[in-house]
Amino acid sequence: MQIKKVVLLLLYLVYPQTKCLSQTLYGTNNYVEYQVGNLPIVISVPHGGDLIPTSIPTRICNNPETVTDSYTIETAEQIKAALFLATGCYPHIIICNLKRTKLDCNRNLVDGACDNSQAMTAWNEYHNFITMAQNTANSQYNNKILFVDLHGHGHTIQRIELGYLLSSSDLELSEATLNTTTYINQSSIKNLVLNNRNNYTHTQLLRGPNSFGTLLTNQGFPAVPSQQIPYPGATSGYFSGGYTTANHTCFDPAVTTNGFQMELNYDGVRNSNSNRMLFADKFKNVVLEYLNTHTNVVLGSCTPLAIDENNESQFIFYPNPINDVLNLSCSKDMNTLKVINIIGQELFNKEVNSNKVQIDLSNFSSGTYFIHVTTGKTIKTVRFIKR
């Protein structure tokens, strides 16, 4: 199993431009997972898991925080779906499936795993997956990627908190002070300050018109820091970023990636499926605009190709665009086929158990569709056009 994981990852690194599929790599006992993507977006979710294996004792070392960030995994999945519908491709997502009572991946190894060997293994696999994802994305997109450590907060004020490793009091400082080398070097977007296409200053990137917080607020989700809410205020709660942000962004001199910790409020964002879907759709707008504005990465049409070059399971479909009949072939038997429209409705679902299939789509309206092909535990997704 471990050899297969490594082979799959290496194949993905060799062919980053030719895949647009949702493939998941799992750590030991499925305690952590890496949903492989091909967008310049890496999202980690450390506190949404619910697994409570009896072989891992409840954490009691060093006064641990054990509260679950409810519905953060579900929110990440909605973000993934929204980005896929917009671009045809996926963000990289790393998830800890263990409940926080068993493991905290946003702490150092000692405090997070409390010296339990299974928890320590999961902690290491989680952070290795983040590094793998960032290396893959940075290689494909010339180090112009964004990392988001996704959390949920329980503070009274219902707004999104963006943590750039600057304290609440730091954010109250003047523009001139925040733009000094001292504070730039403390920031998790340090490299973006040094190299962004519009030469925006540190303060402008934190709370200017094109900052992430301002763009979120403009989409109907108040965020701090932003042009509208430049700093949290001394009497309100605020999370500035934790272990993951400090070790997987350019705050660490050995890392090139820009990023931040994103703490989502509960009401209106995480508390229902409809709210999570709405937020994911707006987040999609924001992250694509943010990358385009600051890094010149344009992702309006990330078109998947028709050939999966993974030697273990070669998949081809043709023609594209199609008139009536879609032909599919695979080096292994395909188990199920699904056709989904651009708004996520499933229009076709069939068990096939064959390596060659023809689908009659003559009754489909003209437009863009996605086909999901299941082969064993792998799901391949590609986009096609019906004339």
Where do the language-model regions lie?
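N-terminal catalytic or cofactor-binding beta/alpha core of small enzyme domains
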Residues: 20-300
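Residues in and immediately flanking transmembrane alpha helices
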Residues: 17-18, 110, 333, 354
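Short, compositionally biased serine/threonine- and acidic-rich segments at solvent-exposed termini, linkers
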Residues: 302-304
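Bacterial Sec-dependent N-terminal signal peptides
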Residues: 1-23
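C-terminal outer-membrane/trafficking sorting elements
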Residues: 309-387
